UniProtKB/Swiss-Prot annotation:
Keyword DNA-binding belongs to the record: no
Family membership noted in the UniProt record: Belongs to the cornifelin family.
The protein's name: Protein PLANT CADMIUM RESISTANCE 6
Bilayer-spanning residue ranges: 131-151
First-listed, main subcellular location of the protein, grouped into a coarse class: membrane
Length: 224
């Protein structure tokens, strides 16, 4: 028998091995190709970027220069703090500027004092309680000025009023009724009506704030 032919068959050659060719050819990564196209585009090196949509300008902002309301309803109605004393809006003997109050004070001074005390104390002291204490001190000691002068001091501290024409205790001791009338007018001239009580003044202030907020704005300017 002859020796078998040792010549390798073309199929046994690595150059023609289909398995070898299958292993040598690397799979194409589509993601890498896509990234390469984005980094190195074929349009002359210009990187394609998504079209930017221009932002639509927002509505203009209006600033009301007439008034600013930053306080909630029911705020304290305490008077402003004054660095320098201000003057009384009426004199001690200008009782006839409010004839009705002068008549009530002359006949029922405890009523006027109770109304004044309730507003000055911002409701902490009721009109009835202050009036009863006034009448009790007047009946027992006949010197209600020792009690009423303390509220005159509170009123002056609240609005920065001067101690005039005399110290508080002297003013109430010699001019009790005139002092009560002056204090009543002072509160009324500053926007606080003692006749409606503290709660009435708070409600009045709330109504005023609501009307101002509902009113059409004036003096506006538009911010670009």
């Amino acid at each position: 028998m002859g020796r078998p032919d040792q010549t390798p068959s073309p199929r046994m050659n690595n150059n023609f091995n289909p398995v070898f060719h299958a292993q040598s050819e690397q799979p194409v990564d589509e993601k890498r190709v896509l990234q390469a196209e984005q980094i190195y585009p074929n349009n002359g090196g210009v990187v394609n970027q998504p079209n930017q949509v221009p932002m639509r300008p927002g509505p203009p902002t209006y600033i009301n220069q007439s008034a600013t309301f930053n306080q909630p309803y029911g705020v304290s109605m305490a008077g402003p703090v004054h660095t320098q004393p201000s003057n009384w809006t009426s004199g001690l003997f200008d009782c006839m500027n409010d004839g009705e109050n002068a008549l009530i004070t002359c006949c029922f001074p405890f009523v006027t004092f109770g109304q004044i005390a309730e507003v000055i104390d911002e409701g902490a002291t009721s009109c009835g309680t202050a009036g009863m204490l006034y009448g009790l001190i007047c009946c027992l000691f006949a010197i209600p000025c020792v009690y009423t002068c303390t509220f005159r001091t509170k009123l002056r501290s609240k609005y920065g009023l001067p101690d005039a024409p005399a110290p508080d205790w002297i003013t109430h001791c010699f001019c009790e009724y005139c002092a009560l009338c002056q204090e009543y007018r002072e509160l009324k001239n500053r926007g606080l009506d003692p006749s409606i009580g503290w709660i009435g003044n708070v409600q009045k202030q709330r109504m005023g704030q609501q009307q101002e907020m509902m009113a059409p704005p004036m003096g506006q300017r538009m911010m670009g």
